[in-house]
């Protein structure tokens, strides 16, 4: 009886140890930053959901910034991590926006198919410290996201040819909003580069 009980305890201890070792040796899930077979057109044609909650207030003029919004630090950190996983992006100080914003620069080896959509240099978009962004999109998408509450067209969107789809994307307050925000950043990247990158995720 004692031998049977001892054997059972030994088996349980060994099983737990084996499970612990297996868990500690598990390969971490890698983040996705690969291209996809889904074309940029198909991604851009996927209807956006309605954004819940009140529309975020902005200045409505240049400098075009959000007003009275308190960013969520964890969501902001995740936005920066995911946005700069897109291929060939460099994180630099902005040359377009206010000090403190972060420019999203295309590396020299990344082709640009819509240079007129970029305001200056190779900084196709920038992220403000509160997690809002300015980025170019196709006009149809810009109008849709404005209608569904995800952002608004820039006050200078009608000033220059190519800027028609220049938008502010509102800050994300939770993971669901962050997913849409990263999708739209990816669509902007695809719009100016002609690539078909998938939205990065971890």
Residue ranges and their predicted role:
Residues 13-15:
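C-terminal motif of bacterial Sec signal peptides marking the signal peptidase cleavage site
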